């Protein structure tokens, strides 16, 4: 049976038809790579909130902004303390050029200009110690300033080192090595109609305590007539009988049964592409090497769900008895050999669709009557 390859660039995100009938689909809440598309706007004091949680703010910065900020911080501390050293030398009379006084002891040796004060600040903070410029016992406030500079800059260096290590050690990069199938399929598994996705761990190091869950996001109208733009419904996935903590050592398929309790129970081959929803899939796991908790995310819209297809097997057994995961087959799907579930009687499907439409009209009528009674 021929397989269809659905790569990241070739898989259709939105199918268009020529002529009349074009429909604008709702924007994605989450991208395929797991990044949020929600824009936070018009928050009072948002910059103050970021400053109050400075640790998280700095860690979340992009590397180019982080490096620029830290380089500017070091240069500013060198310059600011250098200006203060220069002011101390000026007040003490160490900058009076042309007057030689053997009895005059400067606060800082060899600091007779702003450049010299800047170099002394840099050498003191970085503990270079060339030996030309040094502080004397003449000015206690200069000694106090030197101690304050070393304490403050040490705290800054600790903060910088901590944020660098925390950003490097974040499990975010580990989550990027978890691969989701670009599309989802609906097929029969053990006699039940299921929504199926594939997940793979791209590293040899294992992920422990894996938990995969889903959230269905769609517009919902309550009985009171309130319209919820993003109503969340839980979508449960399982792998065979290991629904609690699957062993993700090989690429695995996760199933969601489309039964009476499923929020996707109304899907049919006819209305699948007409639906407006987004299925967000989340995989939470613990990294074996660091014990850090990571989360990998993706989302599926109706145009990325294929009815009557199944995934091409990825895992095979080599000649020398080893399991082999062929990722060239990971994005390939093929027509399911069991066509009974999508070749059902058309009259039955029309009748079911008619019942659903009548039920929807009754709910809208009840909500309208309730609104009129409240008025």
UniProtKB/Swiss-Prot annotation:
<dbReference type="GO" id="GO:0034702">
    <property type="term" value="C:monoatomic ion channel complex"/>
</dbReference>
<dbReference type="GO" id="GO:0006813">
    <property type="term" value="P:potassium ion transport"/>
</dbReference>
<dbReference type="GO" id="GO:0016020">
    <property type="term" value="C:membrane"/>
</dbReference>
<keyword id="KW-0406">Ion transport</keyword>
<dbReference type="InterPro" id="IPR040445">
    <property type="entry name" value="Kir_TM"/>
</dbReference>
<feature type="topological domain" description="Extracellular">
    <location>
        <begin position="88"/>
        <end position="113"/>
    </location>
</feature>
<dbReference type="InterPro" id="IPR003270">
    <property type="entry name" value="K_chnl_inward-rec_Kir1.3"/>
</dbReference>
<protein>
    <recommendedName>
        <fullName>ATP-sensitive inward rectifier potassium channel 15</fullName>
    </recommendedName>
</protein>
<dbReference type="Pfam" id="PF17655">
    <property type="entry name" value="IRK_C"/>
</dbReference>
<dbReference type="InterPro" id="IPR014756">
    <property type="entry name" value="Ig_E-set"/>
</dbReference>
<keyword id="KW-0407">Ion channel</keyword>
<dbReference type="InterPro" id="IPR013518">
    <property type="entry name" value="K_chnl_inward-rec_Kir_cyto"/>
</dbReference>
<comment type="function">
    <text>Inward rectifier potassium channels are characterized by a greater tendency to allow potassium to flow into the cell rather than out of it. Their voltage dependence is regulated by the concentration of extracellular potassium; as external potassium is raised, the voltage range of the channel opening shifts to more positive voltages. The inward rectification is mainly due to the blockage of outward current by internal magnesium.</text>
</comment>
<comment type="similarity">
    <text>Belongs to the inward rectifier-type potassium channel (TC 1.A.2.1) family. KCNJ15 subfamily.</text>
</comment>
<keyword id="KW-0630">Potassium</keyword>
<feature type="site" description="Role in the control of polyamine-mediated channel gating and in the blocking by intracellular magnesium">
    <location>
        <position position="157"/>
    </location>
</feature>
<dbReference type="InterPro" id="IPR041647">
    <property type="entry name" value="IRK_C"/>
</dbReference>
<keyword id="KW-0633">Potassium transport</keyword>
<keyword id="KW-0812">Transmembrane</keyword>
<feature type="transmembrane region" description="Helical; Name=M2">
    <location>
        <begin position="140"/>
        <end position="165"/>
    </location>
</feature>
<keyword id="KW-0472">Membrane</keyword>
<comment type="subunit">
    <text>Can form heteromultimeric channels with Kir5.1/KCNJ16. Interacts with PATJ.</text>
</comment>
<dbReference type="GO" id="GO:0005886">
    <property type="term" value="C:plasma membrane"/>
</dbReference>
<dbReference type="InterPro" id="IPR016449">
    <property type="entry name" value="K_chnl_inward-rec_Kir"/>
</dbReference>
<keyword id="KW-1003">Cell membrane</keyword>
<keyword id="KW-0813">Transport</keyword>
<feature type="transmembrane region" description="Helical; Name=M1">
    <location>
        <begin position="61"/>
        <end position="87"/>
    </location>
</feature>
<keyword id="KW-0851">Voltage-gated channel</keyword>
<feature type="topological domain" description="Cytoplasmic">
    <location>
        <begin position="1"/>
        <end position="60"/>
    </location>
</feature>
<dbReference type="GO" id="GO:0005267">
    <property type="term" value="F:potassium channel activity"/>
</dbReference>
<dbReference type="GO" id="GO:0005242">
    <property type="term" value="F:inward rectifier potassium channel activity"/>
</dbReference>
<feature type="short sequence motif" description="Selectivity filter">
    <location>
        <begin position="127"/>
        <end position="132"/>
    </location>
</feature>
<keyword id="KW-1133">Transmembrane helix</keyword>
<feature type="intramembrane region" description="Helical; Pore-forming; Name=H5">
    <location>
        <begin position="114"/>
        <end position="130"/>
    </location>
</feature>
<feature type="topological domain" description="Extracellular">
    <location>
        <begin position="131"/>
        <end position="139"/>
    </location>
</feature>
<feature type="topological domain" description="Cytoplasmic">
    <location>
        <begin position="166"/>
        <end position="375"/>
    </location>
</feature>
<dbReference type="Pfam" id="PF01007">
    <property type="entry name" value="IRK"/>
</dbReference>
């Amino acid at each position: 049976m021929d397989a269809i390859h659905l790569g990241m660039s070739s898989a259709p995100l939105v199918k268009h038809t020529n002529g009349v009938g074009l429909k604008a689909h709702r924007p994605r809440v989450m991208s395929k790579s797991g990044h949020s598309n929600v824009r936070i706007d018009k928050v009072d004091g948002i910059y103050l909130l970021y400053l109050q949680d400075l640790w998280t703010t700095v860690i979340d910065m992009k590397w180019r902004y982080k490096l620029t900020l830290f380089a500017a911080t070091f240069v500013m501390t060198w310059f600011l303390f250098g200006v203060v050293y220069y002011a101390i030398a000026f007040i003490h009379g160490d900058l009076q050029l042309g007057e030689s006084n053997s009895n005059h002891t400067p606060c800082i040796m060899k600091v007779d200009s702003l450049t010299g004060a800047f170099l002394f600040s840099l050498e003191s903070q970085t503990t270079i110690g060339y030996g030309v410029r040094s502080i004397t016992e003449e000015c206690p406030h200069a000694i106090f300033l030197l101690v304050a500079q070393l304490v403050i800059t040490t705290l800054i260096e600790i903060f910088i080192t901590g944020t660098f290590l925390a950003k490097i050690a974040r499990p975010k990069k580990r989550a990027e090595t978890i691969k989701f199938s670009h599309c989802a399929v609906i097929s029969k598994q053990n006699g039940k109609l299921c929504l199926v996705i594939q997940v793979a761990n791209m590293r040899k190091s294992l992920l422990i305590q894996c938990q995969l869950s889903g959230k269905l996001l769609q517009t919902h109208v309550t009985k009171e007539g309130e319209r919820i733009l993003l109503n969340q419904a839980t979508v449960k996935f399982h792998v065979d009988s290991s629904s609690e903590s699957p062993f993700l050592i090989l690429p695995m398929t996760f199933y969601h049964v489309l039964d009476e309790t499923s929020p996707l129970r109304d899907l049919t081959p006819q209305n699948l592409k007409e639906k407006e929803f987004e299925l967000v899939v989340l995989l939470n796991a613990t990294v074996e090497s660091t014990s850090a908790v990571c989360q990998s995310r993706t989302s599926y819209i109706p145009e990325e769900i294929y009815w009557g297809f199944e995934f091409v097997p990825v895992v095979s057994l080599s000649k020398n008895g080893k399991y082999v995961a062929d990722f060239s087959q990971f994005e390939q799907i093929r027509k399911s050999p069991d066509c009974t579930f999508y070749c059902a009687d058309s009259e039955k499907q029309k009748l079911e669709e008619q019942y659903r439409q009548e039920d929807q009209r009754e709910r809208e009528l009840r909500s309208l009557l309730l609104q009129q009674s409240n008025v």
